């Protein structure tokens, strides 16, 4: 692969403006002066040297957020006032869409078409959605069975820590920050160390939008230091995390050991995509590929276990192979490209090791399975067939461009096998039979089930997992619940003039 084919010239030409921490409305160096490098996954070259926040920097950010919450205007503004600022924030995201998308491309490796025309739209619209909720947070009046009356207040929980992963930094920033701000909370954000650039640019836009100082704070750094400080901080009132189940467990332990702060977790997945024998084979193959190869397979919801009815297995595999081979890999800034490099070297090597393990355990490698080009963390879109449930690639989350096909006979069998996982994030069903669709939908233990589609996400649809895929919901009005507390106010009604 030539340098032009992997986006090298575009990466080097881009001027990265923000590399420091963002605390109390200002870009500042870390207290220790420590820095780290962020790498372009397409070129393996350094994009920028970024300030490295540690425990003392997190503490400074929390103090700013606490002051902004306890004594600042944000939680005391009317919902209408917060709405206007969040709408301005959304407008600025839209106006700076090219710059945000470029940062996302060079920091994550995803194709520009996805970053610019899919995820950037989701990001701005998520802020608009929760802006619309800011002035609609209300309590209830309660009629008690005694000489008292009561009503409830739904109040912001306080300072929230957000730990954001590297696969979709702009969109996940919006998913976490927008509802927290709409509720009246202040936030401390720890972006992934592999993708710090988007969060810093979003912090800059928040200042332009009129978000008061201290309401949004961004501390770049590593999970073992900055992330651990967020999850264990005694003055953070709640925390959210998207990432691996292993790290999610660590965050829960830290939250419990500190101040028992509530935690919302969106964790790993090994989602089933079930194709019944009445499905449109061509459409099912297209959706199956979309459900795994989108974002280079770096999707928590990837429907990577593709269960196919034995009656259409051979025909489906043939169509699936052709679809995978047509998934264009190359220059991330080329409009035709659908597949870029894995985000980082560690993930690249992990995916390749799973591919080798799949071959060793007896799965049939149909296409792909090798590095692509001579530079960058590119892996060919990969398809395995003759996969069985006990194989490691069928049980563990790979988080890469690897599709595996498994054969089934009956609806009862496939439901049992689909549920035979510690995860429960999502599932897909392809069938023309409404009875089959309803039966499987109600039997699958997963937070999202897509029928005759996949990845059909929307601002109004709650998203989250069952089992070890986590708990709590993002998107939809349900997302607000993690950022609000209910207070009950009770008063006597003796001698009231209306009695």
Swiss-Prot record:
CDD domains linked to this entry: ALDH_F1-2_Ald2-like
DNA repair as UniProt keyword: no
Disulfide bonds: none
Binding site for NAD(+): 164-167, 190-193, 223-224, 243-248, 266-268, 346-350, 397-399
InterPro entries tied to this protein: Ald_DH/histidinol_DH (IPR016161), Ald_DH_C (IPR016163), Ald_DH_CS_GLU (IPR029510), Ald_DH_N (IPR016162), Aldehyde_DH_dom (IPR015590)
Marked site (Transition state stabilizer) residue numbers: 167
Presence of the UniProt keyword NAD in the record: yes
Alphabetized UniProt keyword annotations: NAD, Oxidoreductase
Record GO terms (molecular function): aldehyde dehydrogenase (NAD+) activity; aldehyde dehydrogenase (NADP+) activity
Enzyme Commission (EC) number: 1.2.1.5, 1.2.1.-
Active site: 266 (proton acceptor), 300 (nucleophile)
GO biological process: isoprenoid biosynthetic process
Family matches, as Gene3D superfamilies: Aldehyde Dehydrogenase, Chain A, domain 1, Aldehyde Dehydrogenase, Chain A, domain 2
Reactions that this protein is recorded to catalyse: an aldehyde + NAD(+) + H2O = a carboxylate + NADH + 2 H(+); an aldehyde + NADP(+) + H2O = a carboxylate + NADPH + 2 H(+); octanal + NADP(+) + H2O = octanoate + NADPH + 2 H(+); (1R,3R)-chrysanthemal + NAD(+) + H2O = (1R,3R)-chrysanthemate + NADH + 2 H(+)
SUPFAM superfamilies (alphabetical): ALDH-like
UniProt pathway: Isoprenoid biosynthesis
Function description: Component of the monoterpenoid pyrethrins biosynthesis; pyrethrins are widely used plant-derived pesticide. Mediates the conversion of trans-chrysanthemal into trans-chrysanthemic acid. Can also use octanal, hept-2-enal, dodecanal, citral, farnesal, citronellal and perillyl aldehyde as substrates.
Entry's family note: Belongs to the aldehyde dehydrogenase family.
Subunit-structure text: Homotetramer.
Protein name per Swiss-Prot or TrEMBL: Aldehyde dehydrogenase 1
Protein species of origin: Tanacetum cinerariifolium (Dalmatian daisy)
Gene coding for it: ALDH1
């Amino acid at each position: 692969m030539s340098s032009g084919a992997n986006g090298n010239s575009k990466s080097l030409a881009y001027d990265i403006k923000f590399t420091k921490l963002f605390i109390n409305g200002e870009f500042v160096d870390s207290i220790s002066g420590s820095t780290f490098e962020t790498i372009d996954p397409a070129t393996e070259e350094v994009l920028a040297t970024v300030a490295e926040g540690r425990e003392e920097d997190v503490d400074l950010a929390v103090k700013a957020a606490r002051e902004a919450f306890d004594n600042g205007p944000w939680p005391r503004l009317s919902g209408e006032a917060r709405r206007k600022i969040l709408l301005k924030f959304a407008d600025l995201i839209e106006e700076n869409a090219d710059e945000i998308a470029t940062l996302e491309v060079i920091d994550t490796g995803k194709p520009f078409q996805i970053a610019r025309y899919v995820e950037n739209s989701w990001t701005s619209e998520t802020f608009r959605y929760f802006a619309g909720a800011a002035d609609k947070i209300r309590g209830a009046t309660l009629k008690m069975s005694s000489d008292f009356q009561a009503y409830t207040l739904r109040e912001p929980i306080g300072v929230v820590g957000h730990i954001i992963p590297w696969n979709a930094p702009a969109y996940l920033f919006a998913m976490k920050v927008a509802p927290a701000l709409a509720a009246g909370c202040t936030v401390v954000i720890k972006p992934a160390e592999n993708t710090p650039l988007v969060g810093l640019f979003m912090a800059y836009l928040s200042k332009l939008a009129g978000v008061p100082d201290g309401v949004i704070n961004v501390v770049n750094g590593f999970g073992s230091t900055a992330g651990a400080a967020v999850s264990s901080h005694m003055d953070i009132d709640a925390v959210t995390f998207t990432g691996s189940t292993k790290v999610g467990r660590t965050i829960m332990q830290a939250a419990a050991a500190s101040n028992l702060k509530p935690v919302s977790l969106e964790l790993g997945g090994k989602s089933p995509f079930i194709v019944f024998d009445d499905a449109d084979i061509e459409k099912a193959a297209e959706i199956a590929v979309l459900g795994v190869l989108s974002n280079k397979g770096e999707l928590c919801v990837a429907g990577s276990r593709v269960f196919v009815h034995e009656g259409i297995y051979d025909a489906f595999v043939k169509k699936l192979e052709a679809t995978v081979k047509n998934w264009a890999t190359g220059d991330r800034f080329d409009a035709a490209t659908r597949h870029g490099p894995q985000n980082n070297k560690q993930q690249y090597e992990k995916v390749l090791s799973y591919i080798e393990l799949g071959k060793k355990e007896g799965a049939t490698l149909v296409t792909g399975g090798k590095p692509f080009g001579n530079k960058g963390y590119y892996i060919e879109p990969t398809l395995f067939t003759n996969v069985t449930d006990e194989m490691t690639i069928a049980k563990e989350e790979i988080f890469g461009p690897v599709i595996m096909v498994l054969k089934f006979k009956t609806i009862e069998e496939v439901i049992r096998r689909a549920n035979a996982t510690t995860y429960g994030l999502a599932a897909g069903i392809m069938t023309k039979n409404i009875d089959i669709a309803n039966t499987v939908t109600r039997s699958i233990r997963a937070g999202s089930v897509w029928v005759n589609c996949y990845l059909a996400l929307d601002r109004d649809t709650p998203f989250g997992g069952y089992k070890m895929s986590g708990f709590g919901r993002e998107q939809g009005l349900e997302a607000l619940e993690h950022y609000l507390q209910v207070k009950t106010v009770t008063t006597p009604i003796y001698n009231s003039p209306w009695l």
